Amino acid sequence: VVALSGGAATTTFTKVITIVDPVVLPVTFESTSINYAWNDFSGGNVTVVANPHSNAANNSTRVAKMVKNAGDPWGGSWIGLGGPIDFSANKVFRMKVFSPRVGAKVLLKVENAGNGSIAFEKEVLTTVANAWEDLAFDYRTINASNAYHNIVVIFDNGTPGDGSANFTFYMDDIRLTDAMPNSKIDLPVTFDVAGVNYTVTDFGNNQ
C-alpha cells in the first residue's frame, strides 16, 4: 500500500493477508488452505490431528479428535460451513468414527446460523470398538426448504464426559450421500457387501 501526501513524499506499508477457503462438504480435514475451526461447548473439545489409526478403513492423513471433558451431558462442538447445506439431492449423512467402545451414541445435528431453533438431528450407535466404521444418519425427512449452515456433533449425549480415553473419539469424512447403506442380509451370503453387518450368533457351545 502506498499512501500519497500532498507533496512529493510517499509512505509505504506492507501487510500480509492470508486468505482461507470456506469449509464445505465433504469435510475431510485434509486441506491446508481451510481453517477447520470447531466451536466447543459444555465440555466438548475438538482438534484436528494426525490420524493415529490409519488403516484400510480410513487412511486419511488428518482427522478430528473429540475429547468429552467434564461438563454438561450435552457437551460437544460445532463447525460452520461457508454456505447452506444442499439437501436437494442427497439426504443421508455419512461420517467415519473411531470409538473406544460399542454402543456409544453419536448425534449429528444441523442448525441455521442465525436461528438455532431451525435444526434437524439424528443419533446412531457405534457397533465396533477401537476401529473405524462409517456411520449413516438418515436425514430423508429433513425440511430441505430451510437453510442449515452449522454441523453439530455430540458423543454420548446425556452422559457427562470425564476427558479419559473412554470419552475420546475420532471422526472424519463428513459427507452427504443419496441412500442408506444396505444393512439386511440377502441370499446368497457372500460376506463381501459393504455396509452389511455379518454378525453370527453362536449357540450350543459352538464358536
Task: Give a label for each model feature.
Residues 1-3, 17:
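Bacterial/eukaryotic Sec-type N-terminal signal peptides
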Residues 3-9, 160-163:
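Short, solvent-exposed loop/turn segments at the edges of extracellular beta-sandwich modules
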Residues 10-11, 198:
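Short, isolated positions in well-ordered beta-strands
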Residues 11-20:
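C-terminal edge beta-strand
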Residues 20-207:
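Beta-rich carbohydrate-recognition modules and glycan-binding surfaces
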